[in-house]
Amino acid sequence: MEGPEITFAEAMLDNGRFGARTVRFETGRIAQQAQGAVAAYLDEETMLLSATSASKHPKDNFDFFPLTVDVEERSYAAGKIPGSFFRREGRPSTEAILVCRLIDRPLRPSFVDGLRNEVQIVVTVLSIAPDEFYDALAINAASASTQISGLPFSGPIAGVRLALIPGNGAHEDQWVAFPKASQLEEAVFDLIVVGRVLTNEDGTEGDVAIMMVEAEATEGSWNLIQGGAVKPNEEVVAQGLEAAKPFIRQLVGAQAALAKQSAKAIADYPVFLPYSQETYDSVAALAYDELVNVYQIADKVERQNADDALKERVKAALAEKAQAGALDAEALTQFSAAYKSVSKVVMRGRVLREGVRIDGRGLTDIRPLDAEVQIIPRVHGSAVFQRGETQILGVTTLNMLKMEQQIDSLSPVTKKRYLHHYNFPPYSTGETGRVGSPKRREIGHGFLAERALVPVLPSREEFPYAIRQVSEALSSNGSTSMGSVCASTLSLLNAGVPLRAPVAGIAMGLISDVIDGETRYAALTDILGAEDALGDMDFKVAGTSEFVTAIQLDTKLDGIPSSVLASALKQAKDARTTILSVLDAAIDAPDEMAPTAPRVISVQIPVDKIGELIGPKGKTINAIQDETGADISIDEDGTVYIGAVDGPSAEAARAQVNVIANPTNPEVGEQFLGTVVKNAAFGAFVSLLPGKDGLLHISEVRKLAGGKRVESVDDVLSIGQKILVEITKIDDRGKLSLAPVLADEAETHGHDAASEGPTEG
């Protein structure tokens, strides 16, 4: 029996002194019933399967393209058995959902307009090497399987992850393609760029057009920059976009080579144009002039009400024309799309010709800003940030490091101490809708805000807390995610988190059109929701006054010239500087921690003392926690974290930990208020401090009975009884002999028997 015909193509990406990475695409061996199936390999050890399928018939009454992207993480890929009760994979991890979004965002605009057949792309992680990320490889796999599927898809598109690793004087700084997780620890910036290769009019290859960008400064970037590494400012980020182009070109070439051998012919899928030219002309004739006035109303609600009223009038007029036979009956089903298209022309034309936006602002103007902290009682930190009609509430909660998130996924990242959760309730846009578990968009927005702030967080040693930041979008009219970054900076400072620098974010938009035979671009600062919906780009940039901490770019175009993006980056910095001044006016330094926040301190103990501190079955550590009311957690390196609701409780626990793990040798003559823990025929054992017991011999017990003979220690002392004792002898093995301190002796020594702990005799 003959086996399947297997074809492959590969790209070798040269990383200079860091070696090379090989990306290989293979088809024909597995998943042969899918319209397109490609196995993508990274250096032969990481393997993904991407399968693209399409329904046979278009969906009726759909006015959008029904594309679904799913990422399936298989535990066997990393040699693991799932940790769930049923020992099988459940719902997608947060990391898998984020990769779904990375694939969907550049692929969706690459399908032909008007396609209504359901298309599903399933990427399954079959094998992953330790220290590797699979997200950028998944973008390429999804594009390759779609490219050979016979669907009307204007690919290939390619994605590459780059890390900027400083040369530290010995070498030049270098952008490394497909870096390992360990290499990211040495990097100051992490960048995922997706693009396509344009074709010139003469059929030759043109420039690489950028379709999507995800980027962030790394967790270690601050320390690296302080040590002399390059700051990832706007110029450096623009260089990174250029550095990605050769790698994208190679990956696109490999996909094209595979498609040349294996692609199916483009099938004849029905395409449903959103409207006919006749419908568009009719709507434009009825609505254009009034829309010009509507899109000069600054207030969102007032503008929406005027727009809705006009829309109803135009629709009624269109219905009359259709009823009279002057217009095709399908015009009514095409009306909404045609009306939106006319609205887009009105808005874009005014911006490009006059440089004036919907609310009357210029291209670089920011809406009114407002910032306020400490607005919610009892929480550890809170703030409200408002930019125009976008209003975000930020709330910070602090806890011990043992509350950090443990991540069970195929990502090299296994735990996170900073969690950022974003909520977008329906009332934020004046609507009704479902509330409950977060949707993919909310997860993505929260992760973007998280990435923006991680580079400026204090280290675990400087601030030993787990931090949960929640952003509530209370009102939305453009870029709630960047508003979340600003509100979070305020809230974290209000909670007493010593940020290394404040961070602000701004959303940039892009309008492009052919005016007088020339393609013009206009970058918009601080876009409205309508400018996002009717524009060509959503470009979010967050950072400090010195460097960029996070970027997210989405576009509805086939690609954007990198020169346009570089200009938008510089424009975003000016806006960011303005916002940072407003944040600084609201709070310019960390506040004192709230009384309701836990106090966490740390103690370093020898590793060989960890077992002694824990005690048999946790007896010792539990006793300290019960006695002091503190929570204690221990890291493998001997770092002990102590958390309590107040400082004295934490200090009491630290003192007891030090007695056990960092002990000072007890001396004869020291006095302790101890606790009787065991009675024997020859005396009583008294606990002086956790892990330190001494023997009160029966001959010494007699002193407590006035010198009379004692038949049983139980007649004089009971378990749990407090007794003031003095160390009288320490033998060669460290065993302690005790004697009771009688009332007259205690008075002589001036000892307050109400306080526990050692006292000098």
From Swiss-Prot:
Highest taxon, organism lineage: Bacteria
One cellular-component annotation, GO: cytosol
Protein's GO biological process: mRNA catabolic process; RNA processing
Family annotation (CDD domains): KH-I_PNPase, RNase_PH_PNPase_2
Ranges of residues in domain KH: 598-657
SMART domains per UniProt: KH (SM00322), S1 (SM00316)
Residues annotated for Mg(2+) binding in this entry: 532, 538
Swiss-Prot/TrEMBL catalytic activity: RNA(n+1) + phosphate = RNA(n) + a ribonucleoside 5'-diphosphate
Record domain S1 motif: where: 669-741
Keyword annotations: Cytoplasm, Magnesium, Metal-binding, Nucleotidyltransferase, RNA-binding, Transferase
PROSITE patterns noted in UniProt: KH_TYPE_1, S1
Job description of the protein: Involved in mRNA degradation. Catalyzes the phosphorolysis of single-stranded polyribonucleotides processively in the 3'- to 5'-direction.
Name recorded for this polypeptide: Polyribonucleotide nucleotidyltransferase
Source organism of the structure: Leifsonia xyli subsp. xyli (strain CTCB07)
